[in-house]
Amino acid sequence: MPPTSNFGQDITNTTPNDSNNNNRDESNGNSISIVNIERMGGTQLLPRLAGKGVIRVVGRCEDAKENNNLDLSECQLMHVPDAVYHLMRNTELKSCDLSSNVITKITPKFAMKFSLITDLNLSHNQMSKLPDELADLASLLRLDMSHNSFLTLPAVVFKMPKLRQLLANNNAIIDIEADQKQISSDSLELVDLRNNPLTPQCYESLKSAPVNFHIELTERQKEDWEDLTI
């Protein structure tokens, strides 16, 4: 197998590969051969993705080279493969959609490689943490981290200099990593925290927080024990 550094050259197949038409991605007109991907080291760089999964990821990377919007939603990804960074190395991405996968974490490398994106969709995954390096996404305007497994709202979201919209609804968030003094932003317009089991203290703190952006909360129902006096 050739070294992985060769991966990212022309891996599209413009001529038929015998009669094996099942190895092509017909969804967007690309005819990407598994055989060619293997020759370029694709299976080494894209672990846990087999057959059509590799074709789908590579095909969407090729599309992103044209429109600067990387859509890797519903690709059964557990993480962002190194091959994706390699394929996108000469492309200035505007947005990245990683929704509806099984991703458990984003590595610090992501912020370095995709530093110019303005929209990041991480929704419908299995994430519980964000790396502090995401604060380096200096152009990010919108972050969707809804429908994940976050137990706390990461403090890094308040360090993104241009972030306007933060969607963190439908998680398991009970508290915020930052204290009240750190819940501030010159750019934020909306923080959606609906459908999270916030603690009573956190809920009241957010509801009365002296911030210049709107915080959406699901009206909290008091537990029976909260009305008890000792």
Residue spans for each PLM region:
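The feature captures the LRR N-terminal capping module
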Residues: 1-123, 129-132, 176-230
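A generic tandem-repeat structural signature
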Residues: 106-173
